[in-house]
Amino acid sequence: MACSLQKLFAVEEEFEDEDFLSAVEDAENRFTGSLPVNAGRLRPVSSRPQETVQAQSSRLLLLHPTAPSEALGLPDLDLCLPASSTPSADSRPSCIGAAPLRPVSTSSSWIGNQRRVTVTEVLRETARPQSSALHPLLTFESQQQQVGGFEGPEQDEFDKVLASMELEEPGMELECGVSSEAIPILPAQQREGSVLAKKARVVDLSGSCQKGPVPAIHKAGIMSAQDESLDPVIQCRTPRPPLRPGAVGHLPVPTALTVPTQQLHWEVCPQRSPVQALQPLQAARGTIQSSPQNRFPCQPFQSPSSWLSGKAHLPRPRTPNSSCSTPSRTSSGLFPRIPLQPQAPVSSIGSPVGTPKGPQGALQTPIVTNHLVQLVTAASRTPQQPTHPSTRAKTRRFPGPAGILPHQQSGRSLEDIMVSAPQTPTHGALAKFQTEIVASSQASVEEDFGRGPWLTMKSTLGLDERDPSCFLCTYSIVMVLRKQAALKQLPRNKVPNMAVMIKSLTRSTMDASVVFKDPTGEMQGTVHRLLLETCQNELKPGSVLLLKQIGVFSPSLRNHYLNVTPNNLVHIYSPDSGDGSFLKPSQPFPKDSGSFQHDVAAKPEEGFRTAQNLEAEASPEEELPEADDLDGLLSELPEDFFCGTSS
């Protein structure tokens, strides 16, 4: 039988349930004889070293149902949770005493001799008559170091209370029983190098445990084998304690109170690999509470790390839907799992808030997903800053969409832009004046003010532009714009005396738009229509106007215009005439013109005499060649008519 089982467990791949059950039945038929044949059951025993102080150790046993459960015809598989031995006063062969429930785990470091129990010896001891309800058991005992002496009666009893765990599907229940007595441990044997004995195991699940004893209100139910069959119910505060036997699958536990167990996953590992036992699952605050029939005291659960230290540890809680798993990777690789099907409902286990996570879970290779690949790829890439937004940010002069507008092609700023000339009539009658503007604007400043009418005006009046007291300096175009725009120093917005040259003249239906200039700058203005009619031939580009009391019109802070009327005009120096043409004697110069009055008095008498002679010789009947009948009629009108109209 041992050889057949070794061959069965020696395979490194997963085998079917029928193969395992057939081997077990064959073994039972050989060794049991007249005993009734039933499905073989595994009794994995913990391989964790026990405390030296404690005299007895509990095992993870696979028990058979009692007589009442057999009457129902339900064979079951009982998983006895290993627990520390109770005091000698409480342990009795006939009745089962209270025993503390301890999570059994396998230490990663193995010391001392390793023990192995053969199937023949186990069957020989389990075949002793104890009760008519007991069945033969198959016990596979894991490797263990014997720290303290183990004592126990020869007769096999139920080791301890069955601590059951509910499974997810209906009819699935995990029975866990704890007995106060343990079977004697067989002598240790050396490992065989060529043959690897496969042993059923349940991997330790206690990854991180919390210290502290379990409250006494939670106790395990006790089940008597000889006298009566109690219904122990292990109640926990949380509904789902899942088991995770390896990476191949997990066993979630639903919230049902008592359901029969249908499937239990076992993992078979080689003899050289560490064997781990089933550990009761509970959270930091969740404990096990016994049924009303149970009156035995309960000791707190202890984690494998605290067995030698004597301190209790509880697993860390997790989410209720999470499943506890046993790692499937050891030094030998993956282990095949054998599903068994016990069917005896005895008790149920409710899990605390969550279940602990196995300590070996962190050693598993992380699952590579598309999201993980994208994160790694994005982290490895060097960030590239966009060039287009940065370029736009540099060109934006102020917030808003208008800040992206390009600069003007001419390079002129808003401060330099002045009010444009009035629009030209659409009929195009004044196109010839536009031609004059282009022709006159081509002359340079030196040619305009170094000779011609401007030089004639200065020589006639004896003016010097470099004299600070001269009106050519104090009331130049630049000074007028500065005083008017910035300083507001012009009295009644009028300039006392001023001399300007016509740069361009654009006639309209009413007035004419003129651009005046002098050596300091340019300025826009208007010429009254009466003055245009009177001095039509003299008012042309290049003529120099001598003005007095000129009004300055300022529609805005940046735009200023000179308004030239017949009352403001003193003399016109035409580019065609040498000395220039003066006004008629009926329009005398004002006496309060300041320096301009002294300049006019200093002029030679020949100039006035020449002007008077020209007027005396001219008669109303004598007309100039260019004059027509309309000009003759206008010349016959009295002067008061023009003065009244202009005013």
From Swiss-Prot:
GO biological process: DNA damage response; DNA synthesis involved in DNA repair; female gamete generation; interstrand cross-link repair; male gamete generation; recombinational repair
Alphabetic keyword roster: Chromosome, Disease variant, DNA damage, DNA recombination, DNA repair, DNA synthesis, DNA-binding, Methylation, Nucleus, Phosphoprotein
Residues modified to Phosphoserine: S47
Pfam families registered for this protein in UniProt: HROB
Region (Disordered): 284-361, 380-399, 581-631
Lyase among keywords: no
Compositionally biased residues, Acidic residues: 618-631
Stretches with biased composition (Low complexity): 319-332
UniProt biased composition (Polar residues): 287-308, 380-390
Gene Ontology MF term list: single-stranded DNA binding
Subcellular location: Nucleus; Chromosome
InterPro entries, sorted: HROB (IPR028045)
Chain positions with Asymmetric dimethylarginine modification: R285, R295, R329, R337
Connected disease: Ovarian dysgenesis 11: An autosomal recessive form of ovarian dysgenesis, a disorder characterized by lack of spontaneous pubertal development, primary amenorrhea, uterine hypoplasia, and hypergonadotropic hypogonadism as a result of streak gonads.
Function comment: DNA-binding protein involved in homologous recombination that acts by recruiting the MCM8-MCM9 helicase complex to sites of DNA damage to promote DNA repair synthesis.
Oligomer status and interactors: Interacts with MCM8; this interaction is necessary for MCM8-MCM9 helicase complex recruitment to DNA damage sites. Interacts with RPA1; this interaction associates HROB with the RPA complex.
Name listed for the protein in its UniProt record: Homologous recombination OB-fold protein
Organism: Homo sapiens (Human)
Gene that this polypeptide is encoded by: HROB
